Amino acid sequence: IDSPRLDLKPNPLYEEADIGYFKTHYYGGIKKYQWTAVPLALHGVFVLKDGTVKEVSVGEREDEPKFVINDLLPHLASEQIKRTLNEGIKGEELNVLIGSHPFKDDKGSELVKLNILKLLNEKYGVTEEDFLSAELEMVPAAHACDIGFDRSMIGAYGQDDRVCAYPALTAVLEVKTPERTALAILTDK
């Protein structure tokens, strides 16, 4: 079931002021300001030149790093706070912070980007060109949980769309002998 998310652009990796980032574009109706300073996880696949598919999931487990879209501190955001709520964070500002350590054994520019590429190559066997055939997305790195003292509600990423999927599937599965074919269609994109 599709849910609002941040898809990585085809050439997402860049470095600015010695910080590595992924460029994104948002999918679905999001409130952009809600995506800053929130731990994010990376999910998706790299499709390599030889057709090999490398699945990626980073940030869901406690022992894994998370990612974040940084925001300005209130005392540094005098221009930003003049914007409307809808423009407080612009779409082109939804860039995900992914690292800051430079590659150690090299002289030159974009050493943080080079180090991130090295780490991705070591773990997944991918290169920068492999981002062109990748389908990668950033989502909140939070697990579903009970909400309220009485635990009467569920809080989770994607609940707005997914909350309808479970009862639809349950209804189909609980039909004993349908007069006609029972069907629930659950899709993404």
State where each predicted segment sits:
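N-terminal hydrophobic/helix-forming segments and targeting peptides
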Residues: I1-K189
